[in-house]
Every structure is written in structure tokens, then in C-alpha cells.
Regions:
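Catalytic cores of carbohydrate-active enzymes across secretory and cytosolic contexts
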Residues: 1-262
């Protein structure tokens, strides 16, 4: 720990690193350490079914401040530590268990509205909007922007779009789904399986319903520059945000900000 100064504050992010504070404490670190969980926390009954759940919760008490994305997640945490660790409520978000005291709170995140609105009005945003409008002037655009992750519900979204085309054929040739799936954890084998499943679904939909001048699903497995995203959002009639389980999804907020106020 030679890089640490006595008054440094350490901020740890996400579940992969829950044990880090306990390891630092074992090495003699006395700095203030905070932790923020970027995923939903399960209810106590489900949490208690996780192997070594008590070890994980004990590790969280090595932090001084623990943050969650929502009040529901915070409630799950406090209910768990009360029932499983007999934590003492000290008031004002402070809890004592495992011979340590921490502060727990909910800190929902948002977006910088002015900054994103500025991107919408910037040349790159306007150019992307115009390109989309020119290319898809005859069709309604549905837009999805996600990381390639099993929690985002992408197969279910694609199947729902296929169901729309099957049940309401009048929408054929009049609606296009643009789905961006940014690469994520490509070295993990399971994520390669996810990618192949998505590509297979998109291919089957396009083969079943596509025409010479219409591709129902335009699927892009790449990252789109942030400066261009507002133009894509603004061109869309509908944004599809369909996670199976998610934290604070910012796509819905960005989509609203990107719309033309007129």
C-alpha cells in the first residue's frame, strides 16, 4: 500500500471487488473506504441461498460507506443484516455488525441532461439523425442500445419483435428494429454463446420476414460513438429497454432527452 496517503479516500466499485476492503484492512489500511454496488441486490431469502453469503456480508462491513442503486436494494440489505447478522440499527443509515459500523444508503444515478442535450444539438448528433431519417424515411424505427449481457433480455426482445411481425403482418415492411449490442467480456466463453444466439435470432427473423428492400432487424455488435447516439435516439419512434433484471438503466433517460421538444 505504498501509494496510499493517510487522508486518501478509497472508492471500490461493484460485486467483483466486495472482498477488497477486508483484504486492505488485514494489511493494516485505516483509510476511509466506500463501496458502490452496480447491480440489484436480491431479497434476503435469495441472498441467503448464495454460497458463503455470510462471508460476503461480513466483507461488506469492512467498508465505511456502502451505496446501492435504489431504496429497494437498500431495504434488501438492511433486512438481511438484521435477520442473518442481528445488526444493530444506530440510526441515520448507520448499522453495526461483525464488530464494525458502516453507513448504508441509496444513491440513484442519473445523466447530465444539459450535456446530453448539447450532444443532440451538436453536428455529429444532427448528422446521425438526418442519416437515419433519410435511410428510414418510410419506416418507423425501434431502437435498442445495450451491452451484450444476459441480463439485458435481448433474446426476449428479439422474439417479441418476431411475434409482432407474425401476429400483425400489416407492420411488415413498415418497422425496423435497430439493435446495438456493445461488446462485453468477450474473453468469457459464456458471452460468446450469447453473441451467437443473438446473431442466430436476428438472421432467422430477417430470413423469415425480410424483403429485397427491407431488413426487419439491423443488428450491430459494436460500440457507437457517444456523440452519435443522441441522433440515433431522436430518429427512433420507440426505445426498447427490456432488462430481465437491471440497476439504473440510463438508456431510457437519454432517449427522452434526445427527443425534439417541438
Amino acid at each position: 500500500m505504498p501509494q496510499l496517503l493517510p487522508d486518501d479516500v478509497i472508492w471500490i466499485h461493484d460485486y467483483h471487488l466486495i472482498p477488497l476492503a477486508a483484504e486492505l484492512r488485514a494489511m493494516g489500511c485505516t483509510n476511509r473506504i466506500g463501496f458502490f454496488l452496480h447491480i440489484p441486490l436480491p431479497p434476503p431469502l435469495i441472498l441467503a441461498a448464495i454460497p458463503a453469503h455470510d462471508w460476503l456480508m461480513r466483507a461488506l462491513f469492512a467498508y465505511d460507506l456502502v451505496g446501492f442503486q435504489s431504496e429497494a436494494d437498500l431495504t434488501h440489505f438492511t433486512r438481511y443484516i438484521q435477520s442473518e447478522a442481528h445488526a444493530e440499527d444506530l440510526g441515520q443509515g448507520r448499522w453495526r455488525a461483525f464488530s464494525r459500523t458502516l453507513t448504508a444508503g441509496a444513491f440513484p444515478i442519473g445523466i447530465d441532461v444539459e450535456e446530453f442535450a448539447g450532444l443532440t444539438a451538436a453536428p455529429e448528433g444532427r448528422d446521425m439523425y438526418q442519416r437515419m431519417r433519410d435511410e428510414y424515411s418510410r419506416r418507423k424505427l425501434l431502437v435498442g442500445v445495450d451491452r451484450l449481457d444476459y441480463s439485458k433480455g435481448l433474446p426476449q426482445r428479439l422474439r417479441a419483435f418476431r411475434e409482432l411481425l407474425q401476429r400483425y403482418p400489416e407492420n411488415n415492411n413498415s418497422a425496423t428494429l435497430i439493435q446495438i449490442a456493445s461488446p462485453s467480456r468477450e474473453t468469457v466463453h459464456a458471452y460468446g454463446d450469447i453473441l451467437r444466439e443473438r446473431e442466430s435470432l436476428c438472421g432467422s427473423i430477417n430470413r423469415a420476414f425480410g424483403d429485397l428492400d427491407w431488413m426487419p432487424v439491423r443488428y450491430m455488435h459494436r460500440t457507437v460513438a457517444r456523440k452519435k447516439l443522441p441522433g440515433l435516439y431522436r430518429a427512433g419512434r420507440v426505445a426498447l429497454v427490456t432488462p430481465l433484471r437491471d440497476g439504473m438503466n440510463l438508456v431510457a433517460k437519454e432517449f427522452l432527452v434526445a427527443q425534439d421538444p417541438a
